């Protein structure tokens, strides 16, 4: 994948996350600074999503672990545990928010 393709895909994903949070989860604060998107919860925990441009990956840090996602076909898949990005993000945000959060 070329750098411009990577940036288009990751920018679209970051926008999707922001739009989903803004539309349905007023208790989650979403802030983007450059290649980092931070989701902050009322209990002071965070989920941090960031671009890893040299590797063409998306990294996610949760309260429980760190994950490295690579594009496989149409999905971002964690290269260690095999989790799909939206599924993992839904689970992590649900755990940290203490209420159901979905990224369909």
UniProtKB/Swiss-Prot annotation:
Query: What Pfam families does the record point to?
Result: Frataxin_Cyay
Q: Which InterPro entries match?
A: CyaY (IPR047584), Frataxin/CyaY (IPR002908), Frataxin/CyaY_sf (IPR036524), Frataxin_CS (IPR020895)
Which CDD domains did the record assign?
Frataxin
- Alphabetical UniProt keywords: Iron, Metal-binding
Q: Name one GO molecular function term.
A: ferric iron binding
Entry's Gene Ontology cellular component terms? cytosol
From what superkingdom does this record's organism come? Answer: Bacteria
Decide whether keyword Calcium is in the record: no
Q: Which GO terms describe its biological process?
A: iron-sulfur cluster assembly
What family is reported? Belongs to the frataxin family.
**What function is annotated for this protein?**
Involved in iron-sulfur (Fe-S) cluster assembly. May act as a regulator of Fe-S biogenesis.
Q: Which PANTHER family does this chain map to? A: FRATAXIN (PTHR16821), FRATAXIN, MITOCHONDRIAL (PTHR16821:SF2)
Please state what the protein is called: Iron-sulfur cluster assembly protein CyaY
What organism, scientifically named, is this protein from? Answer: Aeromonas hydrophila subsp. hydrophila (strain ATCC 7966 / DSM 30187 / BCRC 13018 / CCUG 14551 / JCM 1027 / KCTC 2358 / NCIMB 9240 / NCTC 8049)
Q: What is the lineage of its organism?
A: Bacteria, Pseudomonadati, Pseudomonadota, Gammaproteobacteria, Aeromonadales
